[in-house]
Amino acid sequence: MPLSKVWAGSLVLLAAVSLPLQAASPVKVGSKIDTEGALLGNIILQVLESHGVPTVNKVQLGTTPVVRGAITSGELDIYPEYTGNGAFFFKDENDTAWKNAQQGYEKVKKLDAEQNKLIWLTPAPANNTWTIAVRQDVAEKNKLTSLAELSRYLKEGGNFKLAASAEFIERADALPAFEKAYGFKLGQDQLLSLAGGDTAVTIKAAAQQTSGVNAAMAYGTD
């Protein structure tokens, strides 16, 4: 049962200015390490290849910082990204533009074009955000349907352990933002940090109650 989400983020293909669509050089296609990233990256590969464009498959390259570094350094030509991550890329979390999909798109498009010569293509009608998902048995037993109720549950000493990626645990616009907004704080013993950012893995950990986990980092599209 997902409880809430942070940031508005349209899905966009982020491309380097030198994207060689009409050249002999293959297009280096990347994606993030998670299942959704793999699906989207493979769609890009198939579309390009169906139009006779040679490609290099770098799908599931790594976490957000890894993929971001790859495209800014020229190791990638194109990958799917979310506009809300502009707040993270440009250390600008306090600007309310990131909570509006269109405003966030316009802002990150301008910043990346000016500073990095990266082009944000036309956004897809898709939205995805981080959420916290709690096992159904825990949610029903403790009447948890929102993060406000989760905060109340935690303050009452409720049993809780979250499986999440290191990125989600550490990024200012992720778990710390949830904690700040809803007035709770998770201790290290309430966190299971898993490699990568694949929500299929975090959700599986909650489903199987790995190491006592009963909640998971998830995506709004999960």
Task: Label each PLM-derived region with a short phrase.
Residues 1-10:
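Bacterial N-terminal signal peptides that target proteins for export
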Residues 9-18:
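Bacterial N-terminal signal peptides
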Residues 19-23:
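Sec/Tat signal peptide C-region and signal peptidase I cleavage site
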Residues 26-44, 60-63, 167-170:
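Extracytoplasmic "Venus flytrap"
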Residues 35-54, 176-182:
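Short, polar/charged alpha-helical segment
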Residues 82-95, 104-110, 205-222:
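A ligand-binding cleft/hinge motif common to bilobed small-molecule-binding domains
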Residues 102-161:
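A conserved helix-loop-strand patch within extracytoplasmic ligand-binding domains
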Residues 156-222:
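Ligand-binding pocket segment of bilobal, Venus flytrap-like solute-binding proteins
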